[in-house]
Amino acid sequence: MIAQGEVVIENLDVRQARDGKHHSALIRAATDINVNDGVLDIQLKAIAGKPILNAIVVRKKHVVANNWQLVWGDEFEQDGAPDTSKWNYDLWPAKKVNGEDQTYTSRAKNVRVENGKLILEAHKEQHAGAEYTSARLNSRGKGDFLYGRAEIRAKIPAGQGTWSAIWMLPSDPYKYSTSCAENEDWQGSETCDAWPNSGEIDIMEHVGFDMQNIHGTVHNKAYYWQNWQQRKSSIEGKNIDQQFHRYAVEWSPETITIFFDDSPYFFYSNEATGWKAWPFDHPYHVILNLAIGGMWGRAGGPIDDSIFPVKMEIDYVRVYEKQHKNNIEKI
């Protein structure tokens, strides 16, 4: 894709879906295009296949509002283990969710604060019945919020088989569940519909076989990947494994917008049709994890064991609310 005489997207190839078997629709965003004469010139060339272009949307450059007030976060200033007043460990076996190949641990080898950064580090090793180890943290019950802005500055790893994620789940996953009790282990359960019913917001997902692309997504009962009605978008991110970038979401009762370095590329609106399309009306919490393999991580081929160890680095996590509101909730 060429805009104003410059290549802004080199490849618009439709990638495989998470199951690695099917193709999905494609929404891509290009940023930092300067128009000086009031006319935007765009050129598209089909290299292979017969693509269908449904729409082109042009938006003004986003300027982050100055009325956000910091209400929760972690700057990772103290070396050692993560602050357990802010974070919980998810200690899970391999294959619990998404077919992921790693086991999540709380060992310093896999998760630690070091030189002002949170480190999530994956290793190729046999441990607890798995062939790989890594880490996953969540802020449930310690940093839950309803509406606002969450911003995370991070550097994510390269390598075939990596699956990095910065995302959010409901702090009450059973709010819209119809098939399971509150004491049931709902994540990874095939009989509990807490997911997708109660929602999910993916601020950033990245898989190593699709190195240049960052993905933002929401999941709910009406729109999620298993019913082929996914709501997602992607943006090209250069040097994402070499430099830190900002990943953010702004969430209100009407809209969800996801950003890469303050460039908005995913937009989702409340259709006012009920909880199936908008379960995003109750507190959520932040999740940080580095998965290995799984349905999406393996979609581009086998895990490359030569890449290990690999690490995801987080500089900070910050949650803001509008100054005239009081929507932060501690559960």
Label each region the model flagged:
Residues 1-64:
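Compositionally biased, intrinsically disordered or flexible polar/acidic segments
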Residues 63-331:
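GH16 jelly-roll
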